[in-house]
C-alpha cells in the first residue's frame, strides 16, 4: 500500500500550521487547494505502485536490455541523468543517513570521492531528509510533491502581500506547475528553484519589519538553498535577490538599513552553510569538471538563444512531445521557462500600465526590468549577456529561463490583480501574447504539414486562457491556466511501474558482495547504477570525479573523458588488477580470455579476475619522479610512483633502494574495512587503490601518518620497520570544522534570541 499521499499531507499540514502561526496569510482552503492540485498532478505515484520517472531508459543498457528499445522511443530520454546519476546518489545518501552516518564519502564510484561535496547528491537537503522514512521509489515522489507544495505555497504568500487571493493563486499555479519546476522536478535545480519565492518573501518581510524570528528564518534559508544541490541556480538566485533588495532600498526609498540587515543575514547564512559549502569548495578545484572548465570555460555565445530555442518559452510542446517525433530543440534546457501564456502577455500589460500611470517606482516595474534582463541574457544580446557571462563564467546561463519563468508567474498575478480595475493592461497583455504566438507560428520552419498542424494545435490551450482573460473572470483564468500547464508539461515526467526502477536480474544477483570492485564493459551496468545494489565500480559518470584519476585512466586505458557516456573498453587491462577489480560485467556473448566465466545469461556475462590485488598492499619498489609520464612503463603490482617523500633522509634511502624479488616483503593483513596490521622488515610504502582526496587521516599504532598521493591519483602512506595497526579514515576538516562553525553560530543565535524581547527588532 502506497501511503505517500498521506505522509506528504501530514508534513504539509505541519508546515501550514507553522506558516499560520507566523501570522502569514495562508487560508486553509488555499492550502487544501494546493494539496489537491499536487495530488491530482502526481496521483498514481502518490497512491499506487508507480514512479514518475522514465524508468524504461534502463532498458537501453545491460543487464536490463530490451529488444527494440532506443533512445528515440523511450518515454523521455531527456531525463536519463536521473537514472544514471541522481537517483543512485540519492539512494547512497539515504542509505548513509539510515545507517546514522553522515554521507561524506562515496566508495562505490571511481575508486571513491567525496559524496557530500557533490552538491547534486543533496546530502543535506531538508526535503531529502524528510523523505527518509519512505521506501526509495516512494521517497522520489514525496520529494517531488514537497517541491511543488513549497513553490506553490511560498509563491502565494509572496504574491498575496500585494495582490488579492485569486491572482495570488494564479501566480502560484503558474510557478509551481510551470516548466521551471516540472521539467526539472527530480533534479537539484528544481529543489533550489522552489526556494525562489521564499527568498523574495523574506526580503519583503525584513523590509517591512526586522524581528528576531524573521532574521533567523532568513538566515536558515541560506543553507536550505545550498543544500538543494545546484550552486549555479543558487548563484543566479542570489544575484536577482540582491537586485530586488537594491530596488526596495533605493527605488522604493525604503532606506539602506534594509541592506545592512540583509548583509548581516547573508553573513550568518554563510556561517550556517559552512558544513555544506566548505567541502564543496575544498574539492571543486580537484574535480574533472572544474579542471575542464579552467581550460575551456563557457565562452562565446549563450547556448539555446536562436528563435527555435526561444520558441518553447511560448509553447513547450510546439516541436512535438515525447515519446513521439521531435523536430526542434524540445529539450529540457529550452523548455524550462514557460509559466503560461499570460506570463508573456503580462509583461506588455504591466508595461502599458506603468507608462499610462507614470509610476515607475512600483514593485511591478522591478518585475518588468528583471524579466527583461533575464530574457536579454537568454536571447544572448551581447551588451547584457557578455558582462553577465563574465561574472558567471562557470555557469550555464541559458538556465536563467528558470528565473524568467518565476518573474513571468509573478507578473501573471499582478496582471490578474490590476485587470479587475483597468482594461488597458488586459488588452495590452492579450495583444502581446497573441504577437508572441504569431511570431513562433510564422517564423519557425516545419518539416511537413503534419508537424505544422501539431504545432498550431498546441497553441489552442493558450488561446483558451486568453479568451478566459477577456471575460475578466479571474477564477476562470486560473482554472484555464492550470489546464494549459497540465497539457504543456504533465507528460514530461512519465508514470511507470515501480518494479521497473532498478530491478534485480539474475546477473545482478550472481555478483558476490565480497567487497572487491567491479567494472562494466561498454554500457553494461552503467556507472552509478551499480550503487543501487551496493557494488563498487571503478568507472565514473560524475562531474565531481577526481581529475587526476580521470587523467590516469586516459593515460593508461585510452579512456575518453570527453565522451559524455565514457566507457571502459579494455577488459584485459592490467590496471584492473591494481584497481581491485575482481568482477567484470559484460553484455551477452562477450569473451574475455584472461578471466574465468562465472555467469552467462541473456542479461549479460560475469567474469572473475583471479589476479586482482588487494585494496591495500606494500610496494616492493618506490620511484621518486617529478611527473607521472613513466606510469605506462611501470608494473604497478611491484612499483609505486611518488612525487614527494616527506620522510627523513635515512628513511628515504631505505625506501628508494632497489629490493630484489628474493628480499623479505612487508605483509599487510586487513583486520576490518580500512584497518590493517602491517608487518614491515624495513621502511615500507603501503599503496592503495583508493582515490586521494583532502580529508584522509592515517594512524599507525595511534600515531598520525602523513597521507601521500601515489601512482598519480591514489592514497598511500609510509610505515616504519616493525609491526603496527594502521587505521585509515575519511575525516575531512572542511566538514567537521564547518559543522563546528555552524553549531557555534546556532548557539550564538539562540543566546541572542533569548536575550531579545518578543517583537523587538
Language-model segments: which ranges?
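Hydrophobic alpha-helical membrane-insertion signals
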Residues: 7-114, 284-287, 333, 493, ...
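Membrane-interface helix-loop junctions at the exits of transmembrane helices
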Residues: 39-51, 97-101, 118, 127-138, ...
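Active-site lumenal/periplasmic loops and adjacent helix-entry segments of GT-C-fold
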Residues: 45-162, 167-195, 301-334, 700
Amino acid at each position: 500500500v502506497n501511503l505517500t499521499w498521506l505522509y506528504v499531507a501530514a508534513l504539509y499540514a505541519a508546515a501550514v500550521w507553522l506558516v499560520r502561526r507566523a501570522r502569514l496569510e495562508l487560508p486553509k482552503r488555499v492550502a487544501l487547494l494546493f494539496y489537491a492540485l499536487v495530488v491530482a498532478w502526481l496521483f498514481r505515484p502518490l497512491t499506487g505502485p508507480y514512479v514518475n520517472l522514465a524508468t524504461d531508459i534502463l532498458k537501453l543498457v545491460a543487464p536490463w536490455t530490451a529488444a527494440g528499445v532506443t533512445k528515440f522511443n523511450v518515454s523521455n530520454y531527456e531525463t536519463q541523468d536521473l537514472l544514471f546519476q541522481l537517483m543512485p546518489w540519492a539512494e547512497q545518501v539515504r542509505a548513509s543517513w539510515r545507517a546514522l552516518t553522515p554521507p561524506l564519502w562515496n566508495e562505490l564510484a571511481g575508486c571513491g570521492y567525496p559524496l557530500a561535496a557533490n552538491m547534486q547528491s543533496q546530502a543535506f537537503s531538508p526535503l531529502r531528509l524528510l523523505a527518509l522514512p519512505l521506501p526509495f521509489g516512494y521517497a522520489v515522489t514525496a520529494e517531488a510533491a514537497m517541491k511543488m507544495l513549497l513553490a506553490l505555497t511560498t509563491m502565494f504568500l509572496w504574491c498575496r502581500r500585494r495582490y488579492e487571493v485569486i491572482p495570488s493563486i494564479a501566480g502560484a499555479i503558474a510557478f509551481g506547475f510551470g516548466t521551471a519546476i516540472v521539467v526539472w522536478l527530480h533534479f537539484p535545480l528544481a529543489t533550489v528553484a522552489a526556494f525562489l519565492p521564499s527568498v523574495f518573501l523574506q526580503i519583503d518581510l525584513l523590509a517591512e519589519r526586522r524581528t528576531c524570528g524573521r532574521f533567523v528564518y532568513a538566515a536558515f534559508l541560506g543553507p536550505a538553498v545550498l543544500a538543494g544541490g545546484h550552486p549555479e541556480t543558487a548563484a543566479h538566485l542570489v544575484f536577482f535577490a540582491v537586485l530586488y533588495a537594491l530596488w526596495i532600498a533605493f527605488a522604493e526609498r525604503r532606506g539602506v538599513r534594509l541592506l545592512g540587515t540583509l548583509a548581516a543575514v547573508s553573513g550568518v547564512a554563510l556561517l550556517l552553510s559552512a558544513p555544506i559549502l566548505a567541502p564543496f569548495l575544498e574539492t571543486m578545484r580537484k574535480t574533472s569538471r572544474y579542471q575542464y572548465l579552467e581550460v575551456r570555460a563557457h565562452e562565446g555565445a549563450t547556448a539555446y538563444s536562436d528563435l527555435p530555442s526561444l520558441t518553447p518559452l511560448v509553447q513547450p510542446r510546439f516541436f512535438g512531445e515525447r515519446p513521439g517525433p521531435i523536430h526542434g530543440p524540445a529539450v529540457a534546457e529550452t523548455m524550462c521557462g514557460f509559466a503560461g501564456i499570460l506570463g508573456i502577455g503580462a509583461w506588455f500589460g504591466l508595461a502599458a500600465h506603468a507608462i499610462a500611470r507614470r509610476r515607475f517606482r512600483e514593485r511591478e516595474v522591478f518585475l518588468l526590468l528583471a524579466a527583461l534582463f533575464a530574457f536579454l541574457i537568454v536571447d544572448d544580446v551581447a551588451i547584457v549577456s557578455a558582462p553577465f557571462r563574465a561574472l558567471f563564467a562557470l555557469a550555464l546561463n541559458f538556465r536563467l529561463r528558470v528565473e524568467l519563468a518565476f518573474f513571468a508567474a509573478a507578473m501573471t498575478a499582478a496582471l490578474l490583480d490590476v485587470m479587475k480595475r483597468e482594461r488597458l493592461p488586459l488588452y495590452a497583455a492579450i495583444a502581446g501574447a497573441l504577437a508572441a504566438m504569431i511570431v513562433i507560428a510564422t517564423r519557425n520552419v516545419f518539416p511537413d504539414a503534419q508537424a505544422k498542424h501539431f504545432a498550431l494545435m498546441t497553441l489552442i490551450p493558450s488561446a483558451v486562457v486568453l479568451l478566459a482573460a477577456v471575460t475578466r473572470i479571474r477564477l476562470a483564468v486560473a482554472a484555464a491556466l492550470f489546464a494549459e500547464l497540465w497539457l504543456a508539461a504533465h507528460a514530461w515526467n512519465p508514470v511507470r511501474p515501480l518494479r521497473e526502477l532498478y530491478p534485480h536480474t539474475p546477473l545482478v544477483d550472481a555478483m558476490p558482495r565480497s567487497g572487491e570492485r567491479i567494472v562494466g564493459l561498454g554500457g553494461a551496468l552503467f556507472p552509478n547504477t551499480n550503487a543501487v545494489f551496493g557494488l563498487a565500480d571503478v568507472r565514473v559518470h560524475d562531474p565531481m570525479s577526481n581529475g587526476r584519476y580521470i587523467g590516469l585512466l586516459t593515460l593508461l586505458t585510452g579512456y575518453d573523458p570527453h565522451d559524455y557516456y565514457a566507457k571502459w573498453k579494455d577488459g584485459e587491462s592490467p590496471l584492473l588488477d591494481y584497481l581491485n577489480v575482481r568482477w567484470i560485467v559484460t553484455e551477452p556473448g562477450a569473451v574475455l580470455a584472461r578471466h574465468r566465466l562465472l555467469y552467462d545469461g541473456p542479461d549479460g556475462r560475469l567474469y572473475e579476475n583471479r589476479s586482482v590485488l588487494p585494496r591495500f598492499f606494500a610496494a616492493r619498489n618506490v620511484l621518486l619522479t617529478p611527473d607521472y609520464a613513466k606510469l605506462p612503463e611501470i608494473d604497478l603490482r611491484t612499483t609505486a610512483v611518488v612525487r614527494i617523500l616527506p620522510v627523513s633522509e635515512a628513511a628515504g634511502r631505505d625506501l628508494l633502494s632497489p629490493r630484489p624479488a628474493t628480499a623479505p616483503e612487508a605483509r599487510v593483513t586487513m583486520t576490518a574495512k580500512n584497518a590493517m596490521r602491517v608487518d614491515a622488515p624495513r621502511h615500507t610504502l603501503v599503496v592503495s587503490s583508493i582515490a586521494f582526496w583532502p580529508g584522509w587521516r592515517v594512524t599507525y599504532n595511534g600515531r598520525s601518518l602523513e597521507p601521500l598521493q601515489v601512482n598519480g591519483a591514489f592514497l598511500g602512506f609510509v610505515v616504519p620497520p616493525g609491526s603496527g595497526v594502521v587505521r585509515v579514515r575519511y575525516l575531512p576538516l572542511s566538514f567537521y570544522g564547518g559543522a563546528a562553525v555552524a553549531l557555534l553560530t546556532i548557539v550564538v543565535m539562540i543566546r541572542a534570541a533569548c536575550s531579545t524581547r518578543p517583537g523587538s527588532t
